[in-house]
C-alpha cells in the first residue's frame, strides 16, 4: 500500500489523535519553558568573587571554618555542607523522604510580578541579576509560580539552611508538647536535659529559650571572636552541654528582653533529646519530614555525640523547603492531603508565628528595628500574620498563611547580615511586590 492508499479513518479517531498531539505538544512546550526558566539566562552577579572560574569550590572544616567564612567557597559549601568532613567533629544525621511526596505542580506561565526599588521597576530576572541568589521559588496555593537557579545550582541539590533550621526545631517542640513528652513550656530546660543542671541555660524555661530571652550575655557577630565562637569552641571539645557551661552571666531577667543567641536553639535540641529519647532528626523524620511529603532526604549536621547543631546546619532541596513553607502556611496541614490532619499542632504553630500572642518586647519594631520574634521565628509588622524563617548570608522562607503564599530564597550574600548589603532591603521589597500582586500588603 503506497502513501496515497492510506485508508480514511473515522473523524472521531482523527480528532482524538489531534487532541492528544496538541496535549503532548503543550506539555513539551511547558516543560521546555520551565527548563529554560530554571537556567540562568541573565548575567549572574559577582561570579569572580564566588570563584566560578574554579567551579565553585567546596571549603573545609577546621579551626578557620573555611567553609563558612571564605567567600570563594560559599556557593559550593552552602550546597555541600552536609558532606564536608569534620564539621563539629561529627557527621550528618539523615531524614529519609516520604513514600508519597507532596504534589507541587507548576503554573503554565509565570505571573508578571513587578515592583519598585527606588525609581526602578523590577521583575524576577532583574532581581536575580542584582542579588547573589542561588535558588528562588515562589509558590501560591500549592503551585510553583517561579523557580530559578543560578551559579550552576540545580533542583536536586541540598541547600544549607543556616538559622532557618531554628524554626524546624521550634516545631519539634510543639509536636513534643502535644504528645506530652514536654509537659509545659514553662518547665526549666534541666528538667529534660540533666546535663544542663546548674547552668544558666538549664535554669531557663523552654518558653524563654524559644523566644531567645534567657537574659544571657551573648553576642553573635559571626567574626570568629564573639560569644558564639566561644560557645562553639567549648562545644566542639565536648558537647553542647559543655558549651553551655561557658555562658554564665545573665544580664536581664529571663523572659524580658530578646537577644539573638544560636546557643539557645542547641539547648532546645538537648531538651528534645531528653524528652523524646531520640535525636532531632530521628524524631522529626516520622513526625514531620515524611508526613509533610518531603521528596528528598535531608541532612542535619551533628556533633560527636550525635546531637544536631539545631541553630542551623540543616540541608534540603529548595522544593522541600517550599513544602515546609506550605506546611506552615496551611497551619500544620499538608495542602494535598488534608485527610492526614494536623502534622504540626495548629494552635501551637499560630502562637509561635503570631506577634500578637507574645509580650510587647517581642513585637515588630521592638525586638528589632523591623522584625518581631515568636518561637524561633521572625514576625512581620502589620495586621496580617506573616512570618519568615531567616538564616545568615541571605537564606529565607517567607510565609503568608492568609494568601497561601510561600517564597524560598537561598543565597550566598557577601555579608552574614543581609541588611549590610542591598539584599536586605531589596528582598523585603521583593516580598512586598509579590504579595502586592495578589492584594494589599
Say what each PLM segment does.
Residues 295-298, 353-406:
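Active-site Gly/Thr loop motif
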Residues 14, 19, 41-154, 182, ...:
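N-terminal leader/targeting segments and the immediately adjacent pre-domain N-terminus
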Residues 170, 264-271, 312-334, 395-411:
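Active-site-proximal alpha-helical segments within enzyme catalytic domains
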Residues 142, 160-185, 209, 268-272, ...:
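Active-site SXXK
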Residues 284-285, 290-354:
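Active-site-proximal binding-pocket segments
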